[in-house]
Amino acid sequence: MCIRDRVGGLHEFMNCKLPILTDSGGFQIMSLSKLTKIDKDIGAIFKSHIDGREFILSPEESINIQKKLNSDILMALDECPKITNDKNIIKQSMDLSLEWALRSKNAFGSNPHKGLFGIVQGGLYKDLRLKCLEKLIEINFDGFALGGLAVGETQDQMFNTLDAVKDYMPKDKPRYLMGVGTPSDLSLIHI
């Protein structure tokens, strides 16, 4: 039995009564890309740098882990691509993220006391971001996260991407800007 199970989840482990948000593992897919293979149907296959063992992170397993952590706000599994000017790579990643978003939603089910956020991907391309957002709205997530930013683009590129998308996001659902958190970023961002 792991420590998390012995203490009853993150709230008890941290002695925190406030809501807790957990990520899906999508960023680790990118940051550990040299040790990761992507299989559309299986998920992300991580290879241990220590002993070479493989670990699979599917959308369903990501949701299961976040549920075991007793997270209040869970993230759908996405693929966060590295910054590139190749629109086709960004589109393929976005399409995969949308497939995984639906699988994450199905694995989550419904829970009036928890929330599942879909992650808007699409790189620096407004048309891809808006297409992704449209599909995530159709899936009917409890909130929406903007992912794939602060991964190598300039601050101006990040702000332009935010400005291009924010007015299209549902006004009645919460928003979360992932991975952005320098003091100068936070003072200038209004989503």
Label the predicted regions.
Residues 4-109:
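Non-catalytic, usually N-terminal nucleic-acid engagement modules in DNA/RNA processing proteins
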Residues 107, 111-188:
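Glycine-rich phosphate/ribose-binding loops and adjacent secondary-structure elements
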Residues 1-5, 190-191:
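Conserved small/polar residues in nucleotide/adenosyl-binding loops
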